Amino acid sequence: MDSSDLDKGLTIDDIVVKCIQSFDKDGKLSDPEFVQMFLMMHPWYIPSGDLAKKLSALSESGDNVERERICQLVRFWISEFPAEFDLNPELGEQIRDLKRALENKGNRRESNLIDIESVPSYGWKRQVTQRGPSGGRVRKTSLLFDHLDPAELAEHLTHLEFHSFSKILFQDYHSFVLHGCTVGNPVLERFIALFNGVSQWIQLMVLSKHTPQQRAAVIKQFVQVAEKLLQLQNFNTLMSVVGGLSHSSISRLKDTQSHISPETTKVFDSLLELLTSSDNYARYRRRFATCEGFHFPALGVHLKDLMALHVALPDWADKAKTIINISKMRQVYKVVHELTEAQRLEPPVKANPDLLNLLTVSLDQYRSEEEIYQLSLQREPRARTTQTNAKSPPSPSPPLEEWASLKAKPDQALLCQHIEKMVESVFRLFDEDGDGHISQEEFQSVRSNFPYLCAFNEIDQNHDGKISKQEMTSYFQRASSVLDCKMGFIHNFAERTFLRPVSCQHCGNLILGIYKKGLKCRACGITCHKHCKDHLSIECKKRSKSVSERGESMEKGRHFSFTLPRSFRRSTLYPDLREEEPQLEEDGVFDDRL
């Protein structure tokens, strides 16, 4: 079969026959690339179970030579894609039936070629938790993000993201391309959430500092992290870090910019140029093509390639959908094969399990774009213009590009598991006297890991001057469930007259009386006694009043924003962005605590 026949397209039956005939009597392949391509890509056109049935039928009707070639093909299929046989029980059972049928007919030589029982378990590829054995006691500063060596932080981020990347299978890419979202695709959904989590965490770590000098120091540290990521050839996390540093919530901080050195600016500009989307990410593609050894692709770029191919080229070469478009199959295979080959490489880093637990919890604490931007405004308020009545349009995130709509909230059960592990790690590393409690002095070290952690006495529920494991776990779980893993607002309380019984959200007792005996938040509507106000642990979640340009109510869809840098020129670390006019809000002031 020459190349012209392939260009015209082939039916599935023709391709199956071609794959079988690619094996000689000694089991050697004449066209291994084509066979591997079809075995990887076949779920795009036919379920794996149906392919197994076709092979069984051909084995039943064929002669001894053809049966042996079929068994060689099945053997090659299992060796190249073992996870498919473990994670698809129906497929595994059909191959066992084929093996038993061969044995029953006395074809033991052919039957022995099929060894499905040796396939290891790949259940870990469908799990979205970050698991690891507990390590020994390490130096305390290894868990302090303010003092953590940038190279060490880059290595741990690489370990965390690559572990998530290694779980992605062909079926995940296929589902994403077909549906344009991650519905029913938790592994890819988790990976994208982690990508966005790194970007948001960087913004929050910068904004957690109260002075421009401190924020500039954090930015410098993350630029150094980005440099190390480039050395590791980890382009995916590099893109997330660069996206976080170039987000509008950071780029608008002009006072902070003035404290960033020209050297740091130059390094950051070079990273932005590398990841620019100009000429379809040409600079990134050239750099990635020269990589040797471990390399972690910027998955967002390659997913865009898959989406573009799927939209531009048809799956089938005929209207009846019987002839496969081989040209499209080859191009899609090239993209996916490059990703799967990268998954086979182990990152040259060693990770501390305790630090991974802390990072996992930190990256899972979701905030909205609006909340982060409001915190940015709190750090450096807008400069008022002379035109007080006119409002400038909101500034977009300059180097970020919204390109995928996917979305999900963090899994509360998994988050609770991470919280429990994190608390164990904190006590093992920061409970210096080993008394099972965190003192106020030890708490200051813990707080360096969580800049939005509330005050000591709010976690110390029994007010005995020390925090137990139960109290810390309870706090994080309460914050996770009540606040939905989001930062809140300070309540804007006003005295109210209640004409019917209302419960206090702190103590649970009724607020009695008609002469302004209670308080009610103007923003979220929560109620409490006056004397309970300062003890209220529930933060304000402002009720949405957002409407579209058409005046319709806008509900947040279920989507992730997997963001990639755009093409743009820069002479400084951040562009000169035009600020919006301040909006008068009487509902509340943004609070930067968890």
From Swiss-Prot:
The Ras-GEF domain sits at 149-382
Molecular functions per Gene Ontology: calcium ion binding; guanyl-nucleotide exchange factor activity; zinc ion binding
| Positions of Ca(2+) 1 binding | 431, 433, 435, 437, 442
Residue ranges occupied by any EF-hand domain in the UniProt entry: 418-453, 447-482
Q: Does the keyword Zinc-finger apply?
A: yes
- Please give, as recorded in its UniProt entry, the membrane topology of this protein: Peripheral membrane protein
Positions the record marks as coiled coil are none
Q: Which residues form the N-terminal Ras-GEF domain?
A: 3-121
Bias kind Acidic residues: ranges: 582-594
* Protein name in the entry: RAS guanyl-releasing protein 2-A
Q: Which species is listed as the source?
A: Xenopus laevis
